[in-house]
């Protein structure tokens, strides 16, 4: 059966049981939730194909990125989907701290778009990670992202962020991995697994969203890994692999497990563990990423999502079950591989609790009764503090150079993942309980009728950006607000 929000909160308090929660990640040993997959939609069984990799050279990564609609095959069906450079997902970008990323984005869609480098701590100004840029159909825009020399390594990704079209474009296929390298781990191989979902009509068109799905956040009936349905992976016993897993779903929560194999967590988002932490499950809200080590044991296994109850709006919006299913299969056969070398300890992340707090704020997710003309399409209007997003309004003004404490509350009956652009958060309290470890995130799940407390370091990157719910139908409907740092 799927885990409930209440169980997740209770587990978050049980550090002695090896639970990894910290607002977004969850693992637990020996629980009766490892139910077999019940999903059967579509074809599968192809070998996993990883996206093409492009790397920076001499400190620069230059990319020509074309957003367009193309015909491809998904789950054995010809489909007309959205692509970056003709593929789903787009290329995997690999860079180093201190690098510059230059992207020429050409919009060949029939709606406006733009680009967000989710997870990068870079300038939000001008042609940087600026969510207020709008690139009309037929237009070209040149982006430049300058990574600081001390940018943390980790798993990031890129996707559109033009308000009002984000959910449709991500659901349609516009996303790709962005890896900031810098921490070396002895492994047999590394894999990038971009998990997404989509719904297709019988003739291969993307299913348009309905009003109840805006309320809950749509979940596709096909869950894909690197654009494939239930691909196959293979390895030898004794090998150790590094898996970079991205939840690129519009609204779906992923409760990942790989029964029969040995999993260790290196980090979530750009946060990192000092030493690998053994886990049985990892919970990724939409937008979260996991950096995992998989030590291979002989036999067949399934990479599964075990199901998560994210709440709902009752009769108005239905339930919010992110259901269980098989994402991929793994066959571990052949001769035993030589034992890999030890994983080196990693540098400690600075603890923001050691700095003085320059300001405190409380921010609330809200869903108010709407009208037929409102963003919620006659049901509920999502927002923050009772207001829907307005690009001409500044909701929070912050002085550059300080650390602030933000209390994020969620009085609604469903979970909301909170994402702050540019400035990473350190989770210090969830469910009224302190978080002991230094836990850095850029997406923090706020449970229904719950709250979390975070510290945000505004030491650099002045400019204007946003925070929002990463259930992207909610974001498009108004659950976003602006913050100006200066």
Regions found by a protein language model. Give the residues of each.
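Active-site pocket scaffolds in enzymes
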Residues: 117-119, 125-130, 134, 265-276, ...
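Feature for soluble, non-membrane regions of globular proteins
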Residues: 4, 143-144, 411
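Catalytic P-loop NTP-binding/switch module of NTPases
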Residues: 351
């Amino acid at each position: 059966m799927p885990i409930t929000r209440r169980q997740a909160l209770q587990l978050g308090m049980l550090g002695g049981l090896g639970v990894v929660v910290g607002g977004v990640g969850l693992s637990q040993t020996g629980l009766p939730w490892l139910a077999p997959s019940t999903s059967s939609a579509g074809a599968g069984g192809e070998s996993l194909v990883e996206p093409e990799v492009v790397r920076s050279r001499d400190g620069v990564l230059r990319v020509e990125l074309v957003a367009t609609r193309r015909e491809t095959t998904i789950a054995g069906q010809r489909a007309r989907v959205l692509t970056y450079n003709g593929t789903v997902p787009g290329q995997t970008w690999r860079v180093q701290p201190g690098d510059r990323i230059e992207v020429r984005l050409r919009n060949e869609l029939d709606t406006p778009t733009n680009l967000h480098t989710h997870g990068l701590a870079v300038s939000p100004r001008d042609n940087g990670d600026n969510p207020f840029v709008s690139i009309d159909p037929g237009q070209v825009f040149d982006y430049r992202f300058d990574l600081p020399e001390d940018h943390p390594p980790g798993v990031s990704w890129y996707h559109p962020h033009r308000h009002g079209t984000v959910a449709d474009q991500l659901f349609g296929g516009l996303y790709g991995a962005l890896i900031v390298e810098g921490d070396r781990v002895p492994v047999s191989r590394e894999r990038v697994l971009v998990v997404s979902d989509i719904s297709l009509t019988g003739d291969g068109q993307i299913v348009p969203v309905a009003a109840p799905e805006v309320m809950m956040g749509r979940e596709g009936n096909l869950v894909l890994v690197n654009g494939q349905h239930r691909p196959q992976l293979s390895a030898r016993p004794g090998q150790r692999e590094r898996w970079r897993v991205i939840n690129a779903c519009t609204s779906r929560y992923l409760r990942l497990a790989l029964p029969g194999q040995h999993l260790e967590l290196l980090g979530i988002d750009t946060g990192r563990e000092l030493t690998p932490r053994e886990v049985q499950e990892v919970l990724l809200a939409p937008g979260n990423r996991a950096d995992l080590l998989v030590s291979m044991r002989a036999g067949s296994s399934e990479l599964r999502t075990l199901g998560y109850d994210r709440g709902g709006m009752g009769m108005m919006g239905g339930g919010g079950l992110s259901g269980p299913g098989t994402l991929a299969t793994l066959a571990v056969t052949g001769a035993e591989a030589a034992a890999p070398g030890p994983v080196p300890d990693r540098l400690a992340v600075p603890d923001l609790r050691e700095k003085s707090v320059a300001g405190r704020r409380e921010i609330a997710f809200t869903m108010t009764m709407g009208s037929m003309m409102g963003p919620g399409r006659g049901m509920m209007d999502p927002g923050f503090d009772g207001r829907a997003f307005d690009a001409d309004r500044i909701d929070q003004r912050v002085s550059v150079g300080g650390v602030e404490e933000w209390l994020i509350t969620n009085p609604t009956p469903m979970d909301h993942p909170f994402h702050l652009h540019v400035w990473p958060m350190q989770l210090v309290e969830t469910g009224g309980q302190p978080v002991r470890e230094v836990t850095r995130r850029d997406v923090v799940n706020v449970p229904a009728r719950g709250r979390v407390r975070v510290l945000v370091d505004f030491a650099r990157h002045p400019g204007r950006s946003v925070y929002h719910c990463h259930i992207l139908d909610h974001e498009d409907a108004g659950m976003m607000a602006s913050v100006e740092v200066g």
